[in-house]
């Protein structure tokens, strides 16, 4: 606890030195305890400058995820009141599924520094190198008809756009139905999965998973993924603090949970505004083969309306097709 108080004080005074005596007084601990906390923070990767007769100043935050900071922020919130962080895991969605079997996970958040089996829609793999992305899943149990839960993927896309914009000052676009895009490349993938009670067959929870590319470079993505993927560091020239981004994502998900499903019109308006697929030629890949058309709009239930080459129209749902832009990503 002392370490977190010292860090909080240093973060509040980054433009000036804070004396050991002042920290000791405000934290209610001894000077020796302050020194010990500073050394612990340095070992975790924080840059802390110390000058005799002036004190301490925070010069760099650690690149590591800091789950203790997140836990402190969200202990009284619907989402994040239980927050678990793993160094390495197969998949944050999978971990929530395992926990759902043994009891309620409503509001639980799983974070990981690395995923060895990250995945997206239709079983596709999601490259999740250690320390380079934000890999997060949350479990929700909304009180609404099951028919409305299908819109949560689109709602989540809007919420994540809000989070990235708040931290980075740039708003991604949305590639229907579940990708965030910057500079015509994939920045983030979203995977929502429903879980059911094993014995009763009743709805248990919906798991929302998100993977945001934060500091990857081309080598991290690999030759197959690099041409269609981008990280915030590549797009902006610098990577945001992952813990700050995680906090904003969880905050946006809490707002989503509070709004769902009553504020559907507001989220629909945002989704229509942010969707980059509309107005562009697309290739639709389904079990029946491939078709070429033009995306003409988003329906009231977040479906994609398409005009085919023969002039006919159709509204697609997220579960039945894969949509690829004909140009770039």
Residue ranges and their predicted role:
Residues 2-166, 188:
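N-terminal lobe of the biotin/lipoate ligase/transferase fold
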Residues 3-8, 20, 26, 106, ...:
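Catalytic beta-strand/loop module used to bind and position nucleotide/cofactor moieties
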């Amino acid at each position: 606890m002392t370490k977190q108080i010292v860090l909080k004080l240093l973060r509040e005074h980054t433009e000036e030195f804070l004396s050991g005596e002042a920290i000791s007084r405000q934290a209610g601990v001894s000077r020796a305890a302050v020194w010990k906390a500073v050394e612990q923070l340095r070992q975790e990767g924080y840059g802390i400058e110390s000058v005799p007769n002036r004190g301490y100043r925070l010069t760099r935050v650690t690149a590591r995820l800091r789950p203790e900071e997140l836990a402190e922020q969200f202990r009284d919130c619907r989402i994040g009141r239980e927050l678990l962080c793993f160094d390495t895991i197969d998949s944050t969605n999978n971990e929530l599924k395992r926990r759902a079997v043994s009891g309620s996970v409503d509001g639980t958040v799983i974070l990981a520094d690395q995923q060895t089996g990250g995945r997206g829609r239709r079983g596709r793999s999601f490259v999740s190198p250690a320390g380079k992305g934000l890999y997060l899943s949350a479990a929700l149990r909304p009180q609404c008809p099951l028919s409305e839960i299908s819109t949560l993927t689109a709602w989540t896309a809007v919420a994540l756009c809000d989070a990235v914009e708040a931290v980075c000052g740039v708003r991604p676009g949305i590639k229907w139905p579940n990708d965030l895009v910057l500079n015509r490349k994939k920045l983030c993938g979203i995977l929502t999965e429903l879980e059911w009670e094993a014995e009763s067959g009743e709805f248990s929870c919906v798991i929302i998973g998100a993977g945001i590319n934060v500091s990857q470079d081309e080598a991290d993505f690999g030759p197959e993924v690099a041409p269609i993927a981008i990280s915030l560091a590549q797009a902006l020239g610098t990577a945001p603090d992952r813990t700050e981004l995680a906090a904003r994502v969880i905050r946006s998900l809490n707002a989503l949970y509070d709004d769902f499903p009553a504020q559907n019109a507001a989220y629909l308006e945002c989704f229509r505004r942010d969707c980059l697929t509309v107005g562009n030629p697309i290739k639709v890949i389904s079990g029946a083969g491939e078709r070429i058309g033009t995306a003409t709009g988003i329906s009231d239930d977040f479906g994609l309306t398409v005009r085919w080459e023969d002039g006919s129209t159709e509204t697609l749902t997220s579960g039945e097709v894969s949509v690829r832009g004909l140009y770039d990503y």
